[in-house]
């Protein structure tokens, strides 16, 4: 069970007591409305903060300090959750009860997080220019590596054309041009502003009591002058009109991406039915798209669907030969129409239900998966706790899935055609 504590206005701790693990975790996230003008800066910030503090001014010093904390680790945390982008740090550390000779780990870990957040290496009124330039190169490399994965690239292009006036079309890490414009002083000014204004979400998993950790976290944040600006609520997909676009590229396998929209989100009652519909339609090896379009008809090399529950968007991605484009388009639509017409078997529903339930069962397998699921779910606006979600999935019937399918409409598509095909 998750306990929720408001430490200060706009500062929330979500507390998950669990003594099963030797490791605990603590995440710190600044939650921002997703915006093109700051996405790249938010993506860059955690990496710069991790480069050094006033007491531990370089990576070697940080590594030695974490080794002293029984091999603790701190990593960058950048997420996109619907209309939000989060930027922050994730800490993993041994529980105090496993330390030798009564050593403490939790309190020094929280203090080190404080130093990373509030005592960075400074230079001429900004972050270290060397640190910023180095991490800009790393971020650009990450952005380009995603672009070099043509499946990921095509999916991102689809979301851009579907969401020209919706924050969901903004890349999670920003773009190369935005990264290149960032300088150390501007990044520090931005950081100071979002520390003051942003909603702060912290998530703890471990065996410490709330009475133990809350004073540590309050003390960590006491030095921040806050002027919290309320965060807008998540919104469903903003439809600015559909598009069907194409692009050519020197690749051997073409990529077809199709986007469908629905009013069903994770904030509506029939969310579980839409999750099962997505699984039956295209998510997994028992889905209609995989079993029919790929296996029986051999029309594609790969195919699958994904449901963005915060926005009410389902996307289908397929790796195909260019000459099969129209055939594959038509067959994807036909497989959805089969669902809409009620041609779903009990076997398909059972397989889909078990796939979703299996995923839910793994949520509590590790501190990291607990934090990842629940921290994201709370930001996304999901109205069901884990057990309510599980029961909702169990109770879904074929008629519910068919009703969910009937709400889906094709909105946009993007075709990335190989020039050599």
PLM feature segments, named:
Residues 1-69, 101, 175-178, 188-292, ...:
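His/Glu-rich zincin catalytic helix
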Residues 14-16, 22-42, 59-115, 151-174, ...:
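M16 family metallopeptidases and their MPP-like homologs
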Residues 52-55, 97-100, 119-128:
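Short, polar/flexible loop-turn hinges at active-site or ligand-entry regions and domain interfaces
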Residues 70-75, 179-190, 242, 296-303, ...:
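Short amphipathic beta-strand starts and helix->beta connectors
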Residues 79-80, 188-195, 304-308, 402-406:
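Short, flexible, solvent-exposed loop/turn segments with mixed acidic/basic and small polar residues
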Residues 139, 143-147, 158, 162:
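Glycine-rich, mobile lid/loop segments that gate access to catalytic sites or pores
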Residues 141-145, 242-255, 357-368:
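Short, low-order "capping/linker" segments at domain edges
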